[in-house]
Design a protein with these regions (language model features):
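Cellulosome-associated attachment modules in secreted, modular CAZymes
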Residues: 4-82, 149-155
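Short glycine/proline-rich turn/loop motifs
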Residues: 17-19, 146-159, 235-240, 303-309
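A glycine-rich, coil/turn loop motif that links secondary-structure elements
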Residues: 22-28, 50-59, 129-130, 157-167, ...
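GGW-centered surface loops in extracellular recognition modules
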Residues: 82-104
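Active-site microenvironments of metalloenzymes and redox enzymes
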Residues: 108-116, 121-211, 327-331, 336
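Short Gly/Pro-enriched turn/cap motifs at secondary-structure boundaries
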Residues: 120, 234, 243-246, 312-317
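Functional-site microenvironments in short loops/helix caps that host divalent-cation chemistry
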Residues: 156, 167-305
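Short proline/glycine-enriched turn/loop segments at secondary-structure junctions
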Residues: 276-281, 309-317
Length: 339
């Protein structure tokens, strides 16, 4: 078992939380805690002490973080990043690497299981890559050199999802990223976003991106205060956005497509049967964002029949506006390899 929800054990429920990494409650963090954590995960007997990275869940990544602490002497879950699978395309820009997950395209019936929609409506998607995580502060700084103009006054952690974006902030970022990498990234179209969020050809038909239990896969209005308290206890004055990749990924290995920050989509619309990779651009067309955020309720986080959160203008900025990247597989230079 690689993942488990947990509950406070009775003798600790009313008292202080255990020190980070002290799985055995003996006020010492050592290899015995790694062994105990592995045992707890395999047997499903996890407690709050197994939550090494502070995301209110026990997971195999807590073991990884605990081992890092024993090897390097640091235990800071704000620097955590999810493991990158071999199938990912890894791109590096100015020393910062990020992963793109492959999404197999084909004929796609987006409304097949949606109420009050035409189940026969379909579009065609070619193969593409979707960002394994939302664009982070670290990546934004590597590309742009400074935070978004309207970002808050707090000091963000490098693996937080970047926020406070407008549509044109995203466009400026992508234009600069493409200059630096020689690749052709773009914002997700509506169909690309929903198809990937639902798990593509491996879709389990879940309500949220990877699960019917929103708490497994998303930071949203209903659980954000728990993690905020842990963050503020450890880092007073911390921001109100959250590190990426702390929840379970969906069927494609993509994180946070439900919750955390909402993700702005590309302009455009499409008629039935058209190729959704090439859209008519219209600067007057409204801008949408999908996926909900940690400021929104669960309804906004659905990937089946999601609520379309519309911005009135492409220059509109909201505190939970974030970005996820897309890259067409056909646009990659011949022989391109991860770097």
């Amino acid at each position: 078992m690689l993942f488990s929800a947990f509950a406070l054990v009775p003798d600790r429920a009313a008292g202080a939380l255990p020190m980070y990494g002290d799985v055995n409650f003996n006020e010492v963090v050592d290899i015995d805690d790694v062994i105990a954590l592995a045992d707890h995960l395999s047997t499903g007997t996890t407690t709050i002490a197994d939550d090494v990275n502070g995301d209110l869940e026990a997971h195999i990544r807590d073991i990884t973080l605990l081992i890092d602490y024993l090897l390097y002497g640091e235990l800071e879950f704000d620097l955590y990043s999810p493991p990158v699978p071999d199938s990912a395309l890894v791109v590096t820009v100015n020393g910062v690497s990020f992963a793109m997950m492959p999404v197999k395209g084909g004929d796609y019936y987006p409304y097949k299981n949606w109420p009050n929609h035409d189940p026969e409506f379909h579009v065609t998607l070619s193969d593409y890559y979707m960002g394994m995580t939302e664009v982070t502060i670290e990546l934004w700084l590597a590309v742009m050199g400074s935070r978004p103009l309207h970002a808050g006054l707090y000091t963000p952690k490098p693996n937080e999802a970047v926020d406070c974006l407008s549509f044109w902030d995203c466009k400026d970022f992508i234009a600069r990223l493409n200059e630096l990498t020689g690749l052709e990234f773009h914002m997700p179209t509506k169909a690309q976003w929903v198809y990937a969020a639902m798990g593509g050809q491996w879709s389990g038909g879940y309500t949220y991106a990877g699960s019917n239990d929103i708490d497994e896969v998303a930071w949203y209005e209903g659980n954000r205060l728990d993690i905020y308290k842990r963050l503020l206890d450890k880092w007073p004055g911390t921001s109100y956005e959250l590190p990426v990749g702390m929840k379970k990924p969906n069927e494609l290995g993509i994180y946070d497509m439900s919750g955390n920050v909402a993700e702005l989509l590309e302009f455009g619309h499409v008629e039935q049967g058209e190729n959704y990779d090439e859209l008519e651009r219209d600067s007057l067309y409204p801008v949408y964002k999908y996926g909900g955020s940690n400021f929104r309720n669960a309804s906004y986080c659905k990937v089946i029949d999601p609520i379309e959160a519309m911005l009135l203008h492409s220059f509109t900025i909201a505190i939970d506006n974030g970005l996820r990247l897309v890259l067409q597989a056909s646009s990659l230079p011949a022989g391109y390899r991860s770097k």
